[in-house]
């Protein structure tokens, strides 16, 4: 079975790309021959090539735009991208014919590359729904009618959460919910939750406004009477936002309570050293770091929205609304260690029990399309 995966990025610092690598590993282990098309060179291609996966660079462009973009500018860019993408689609068409591909898988909704070629060649198309488009997020499709027509004509769409499935239900009736597979921590925790002198809090996510790191920093300023330390891990993707974070930290004398690190490929192992993990994102279609935190046995406190609320429902974590409420939840957790441990245990059982079969289910879906 030959499967072509189409990635919207050449980077390897996002959940979509990490999940794609995990899926391809599973495919190789189960006798499937994967190929991957990428829009540009980068760490993802290097990783795939090291795994023996054949890749090709075809310079297709996204079909989404920032919603704040002026309408005239957006329309002009859309027309230019249509021309470029049609040219690149010809290259994809020839690639699919040359390799006699059995199935095409588009890994995100950020691109539509390959969808037209798959339709013309009558090749089954599976499309992953990993992102919100339109409200409440900052991005949307250039042309919604065209976008939803292509999505609705896919053989099947895979929603990564119930929240995402509900979001697209108005436009699509060909979707199925399959949670991404997640790997259990390879190491065990070295100490019980809340057993050390300092409560260790961690937030993993690239630093930009929609990831909400300011919620955590503002909450920290209201908890200086407690022995706590906050670690932020993630790339600085928004200079103005990072500057705001640093200014607030200095103004409120929080530097000794805060460690700010860049992206770390081993970040998930730092979860095993943490008591509380935060997800302050404004909107999560899935929440890979949330699941990793649950699996690692942390007490997870998340923003009460989207898939974060889905994952932490039924007593699997704590939910907050606003930085002041976040500080209240953190204080409660520290002052109630026994109850916090019970919540973390329930979350860990859910994490380990619910995210082990995703890749198997996806591959079974692929096979059912042939």
Locations of the language-model features?
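A conserved mid-protein helix/loop that constitutes part of the nucleotide-sugar donor-binding site
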Residues: 14-22, 199, 208-222, 243
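Glycosyltransferase donor-sugar binding loop
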Residues: 37-43, 204, 229-243
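Carbohydrate-associated surface elements
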Residues: 163, 181
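Nucleotide-activated donor-binding/catalytic signature segment of Leloir-type glycosyltransferases, i.e.
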Residues: 242-263
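Aromatic "clamp/platform" in nucleotide-sugar-dependent glycosyltransferases that forms part
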Residues: 282
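Short hydrophobic beta-strand element within catalytic cores of glycosyltransferases
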Residues: 299-302
């Amino acid at each position: 079975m030959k499967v072509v995966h189409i990635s919207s990025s050449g980077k390897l610092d996002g959940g979509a790309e990490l999940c794609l690598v995990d899926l391809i590993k599973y495919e190789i282990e189960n006798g499937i021959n994967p190929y991957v098309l990428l829009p540009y060179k980068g760490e993802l291609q290097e990783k795939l090539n090291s795994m023996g996966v054949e890749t090709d660079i075809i310079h297709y462009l996204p079909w989404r735009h920032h919603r704040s973009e002026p309408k005239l500018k957006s329309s002009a860019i859309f027309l230019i991208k249509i021309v470029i993408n049609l040219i690149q689609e010809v290259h994809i068409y020839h690639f699919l014919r040359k390799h006699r591909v059995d199935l095409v898988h588009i890994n995100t909704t950020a691109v539509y590359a390959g969808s037209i070629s798959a339709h013309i060649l009558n090749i089954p198309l599976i499309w992953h729904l990993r992102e919100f488009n339109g409200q409440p997020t900052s991005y949307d499709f250039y042309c919604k009618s065209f976008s939803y027509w292509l999505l609705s004509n896919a053989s099947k769409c895979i929603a990564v959460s119930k929240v995402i499935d509900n979001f697209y239900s108005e436009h699509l009736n060909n979707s199925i919910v399959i949670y991404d597979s997640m790997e259990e921590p390879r190491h065990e925790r070295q100490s019980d939750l809340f057993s050390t002198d300092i409560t260790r809090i961690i937030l993993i996510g690239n630093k930009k406004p929609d990831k909400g790191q300011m919620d955590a920093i503002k909450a920290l300023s209201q908890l200086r009477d407690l022995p706590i330390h906050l670690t932020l891990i993630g790339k600085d993707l928004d200079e103005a936002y990072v500057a705001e974070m640093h200014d607030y930290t200095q103004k409120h004398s929080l530097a000794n309570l805060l460690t700010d690190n860049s992206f770390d490929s081993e970040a998930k192992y730092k979860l095993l050293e943490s008591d509380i993990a935060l997800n302050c994102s404004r909107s999560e279609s899935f929440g890979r770091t949330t699941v990793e935190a649950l699996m690692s046995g942390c007490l997870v406190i998340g923003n009460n929205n989207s898939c974060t609320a889905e994952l932490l429902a039924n007593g699997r974590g704590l939910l907050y609304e606003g930085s002041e409420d976040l500080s209240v939840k953190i204080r409660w957790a520290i002052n109630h260690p026994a109850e916090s441990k019970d919540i973390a245990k329930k979350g860990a059982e859910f994490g380990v029990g619910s995210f082990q079969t995703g890749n198997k289910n996806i591959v079974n879906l692929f096979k059912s399309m042939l």
